[in-house]
Amino acid sequence: MLPQVILNHLGSIGEAASTWFSENKYFGSVGQCPPLPKGDLNYDIYMGYPEMFAWDKKRCVAYVSNLYNATVSTWDPYKSVVLDTIHFPGLSHAGNSASPNPLHASGIILRPDAYHAETLEVVIDNGDAFYSDGFNVSGPDHLMSIDLKTKEVTSQLRLNNGLYAGYADASLGPDGNTYVLGTYSSNILRVTPDKEISTFYVAEPLGPPRLYGFTGIAHVGDAMIVPDNIIGQLIRFDVRDKVGTPVTIKQTPYHEFKTANVLHFPERYNDTILLVAENMTPDYPYGGVSVYQDKTKQFNEVEFLGFLPSRLTNALTTSARQMADRIYVVALPTDGANITVAGESSRFPFQDITEELDLMILPEIKDEARDEI
């Protein structure tokens, strides 16, 4: 832990950084939601174990996917209170046992977009695909649709075809289609608004053995970005293609990863910054967030700016996303009987990394800030 005088100094630099960004119109729009206070937030729910969240800019709440019990909670970060929790009949469960029900809640998106959210889509995946290291891809895996006015399930679409699975994330493409990403073998499904499913991409061979491949997914323009943990590279697809063709994104300097998870383009930085959560690294056993930049927003190649380690211990970093005007890291505690089940935790800190990101993205403002302190 840093001495308070250093923390105060960093806070002053961070405030100056935020002022610099705002004056230079670097920040993207954050909608009508009021700003959140600086500092970490606490997501309090018994056995919640969050993996990621989606920010509703219409209602100013977050929808949090509770991994181990396959539920989704509506959370008000301003009041630090869980408003409700959506349970899926026949799918959601207690979470403290992976037998007979190993289902998870993972990828989560808003339709038609975060500003006019009417429908929530959630991936309910078979955790056994991950526990078995890709051997069991039998499913079931579902894409659930929920009416945000009534909180009722309006659609339950089975994703799995028995050949490849490991579904862990989803993203809404610029073409209006939902893209669901699988890990074993690396694959991407395209789901139309009419719930028609096609395979946009699948890596050969189908296995087994199946290696830990694609994980997170995010869109910027017509580009779809995913991390390939097998080769430790960021991969780019063009959603305008009928069938996806993977293209490796050049990194300068190269940053190796093997446990990348959720990806995110924060609106705060006008889609010029890509955040990649990493569960763990050789240097940081509890993971953190790698930061990439492309000022052109094309993401044909990126500059690796650095890595922000998680401040939590005994937890795996799973995602880093924007909520209102700030960026938070979500980490999954590993206090269960094993990695496949929930423990007894009731409080889950969301780490605020906004100031650290601001300074990393434009380090030259440190000198300007110090002159003002």
UniProtKB/Swiss-Prot annotation:
Expression induction or repression: Expression is positively regulated by the trichothecene cluster-specific transcription activator TRI10.
Disulfide pairings: none
Disruption phenotype annotation: Does not affect the production of trichothecenes.
Role summary: Part of the core gene cluster that mediates the biosynthesis of trichothecenes, a very large family of chemically related bicyclic sesquiterpene compounds acting as mycotoxins, including T2-toxin. The biosynthesis of trichothecenes begins with the cyclization of farnesyl diphosphate to trichodiene and is catalyzed by the trichodiene synthase TRI5. Trichodiene undergoes a series of oxygenations catalyzed by the cytochrome P450 monooxygenase TRI4.
Family recorded in the similarity comment: Belongs to the TRI14 family.
Protein name: Core trichothecene cluster (CTC) protein 14
Organism the protein comes from: Fusarium sporotrichioides
